[in-house]
Amino acid sequence: FGTHIELLEMCELKAYREEVSDGELKRKLDEFYDKFNVEASCSSEELVRAARTSVALDKLVNVHQLGAMAYYYEGFCGNDYENIVTSVIAGNTLLTGYGIPVAGECEVKNAQAMKIMSLLKAGGSFSEFYAMDFKDDIVLLGHYGPAHFAIAEEKVKLVPLPLYHGKPGKGLSIQMSVKPGDVTLLSVCEGRDGVFLLAAEGEAV
């Protein structure tokens, strides 16, 4: 693809996070309430934590002129970096919706596939296969990380998770259902002869 990759540092994101002003924080919280259906169970502390991280992510993207991002980080024993990484989902979802797709699990190829779908105005949201019912020809897919507003059936919900699955900590996450209709799955793959695209078509029901 000729992709230029920047290796980003958590300490840089932390520095931007510490510089967030009260005005920036208020504007980001207003953006949350505009873009998300914020569940009443979301605490003000978690909303502020996620909003502060979202502002920092915006700055990181602008400074490095990022067109997409892939990340993975766990942190350690509740340290500052864990506090950051457990509050990124809301901000990453906003970036994804604004054409800067963000993929978890440090999946660079997935971020590239999301970028292609975004440029085609087809959304682009990381998803994982959960189960396949060959008898009824049904595939179950889902994910609890960042998503894309364009494929949501209703306004995307912002909800609290008391415990993250597969990683430490807790924080805000999003909930959405894919709108019924035609869907396209796209993967960027690499084989013996180089990079290729793998696509599938289906229907969301």
Put a short name on every predicted segment.
Residues 1-83:
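A charged, amphipathic alpha-helical module
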Residues 49-205:
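Anaerobic metallocofactor- and corrinoid-dependent redox/one-carbon enzyme cores
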